[in-house]
Swiss-Prot record:
HAMAP family: TsaD
Similarity comment text for this entry: Belongs to the KAE1 / TsaD family.
Name of the protein: tRNA N6-adenosine threonylcarbamoyltransferase
Localization in the cell: Cytoplasm
Annotated disulfide bonds: none
Keywords: Acyltransferase, Cytoplasm, Iron, Metal-binding, Transferase, tRNA processing
Amino acid sequence: MLTLGLESSCDETACALVDAKGHIMANVVFSQQDHVAYGGIVPELASRAHLRVFPSVVDSALKESGVSLEDIDLIAVTHTPGLIGSLAIGVNFAKGLAIGCQKPIIGVNHVEAHLYAAYMEAENVEFPALGLAVSGAHTAMFLMEDPLTYKLIGKSRDDAIGETFDKVARFLGLPYPGGSLIEKLASCGCEESYSFSPSKVPGCDLSFSGLKTAVLYAIKGNNSNSRTPLPELSEAEKSDIAASFQRAAFTSIAQKLPNIVKKISCRSILVGGGVASNKYFQNLLKNTLNLPLYFPSSKLCTDNAAMIAGLGRELFLSDKSTIGIHPCARYHWESISASLSPLP
């Protein structure tokens, strides 16, 4: 079975082809640059860009893989969660291809696909597993009873960790997106220079808004207000702030995991999303948890269509096809957090 995957949940327009064995034949991603000037994603610009470049992105993927639309057996497309306009462009484009080529189509959950990306490149993953999604828009933990079953354990109550990194990068005068720039700065700084506290939200949930505010006050001063301009910082100060922030942000997640892992009796951990590529985070998890850890390669950490095609193929073969695919900005998973309480 040859599966064509389409991804457009945010600002990446992507197309990939995955063969019958799950091997990636092509993985083309167009990253929009228009948002850099605004310091974040402008939904209307993102939608227009998807509409403009989807045909050429699909054409590039077909050429790279050496196949034609007639060779495709299945079309998989991201339909939730994400920016509603961007999702609508992708879903309708996929429906057009499916109708024109008379191929079956299946909708894929973007967050679940991020976790599947880690599974896709791994071998002999044992279940049940803990799925940890860490991206610009989502921070959540899942019980994965198998590669296709996701039950919500906990999530961020406010900002996602990737979004928090981008906002702190802006405080430090860094361009968007700022995650990798924070990581680079932090490698030259002292993580104990500032005493930023990890999240203290009880139970399985997380919070990053307090940490974000603490960093802002550390830069502006405690007596500042919203109109107080950001001061000029030396490179050494930026590095120390970045390192201290990074430690607190990732510790907020890592400190929760030992108790959760014990509660759900998981046998492995799958980590997905753009933030999963952070080496400091990877090492922290390895030092915190005595379980097999699986991270996607860097090309599959960020938004891509290979993970959409891979998961879509598995869902189709498992007869879990989506009837009536519609774009949906938010998705509500079955939650099992109540059954895990109390957690410290």
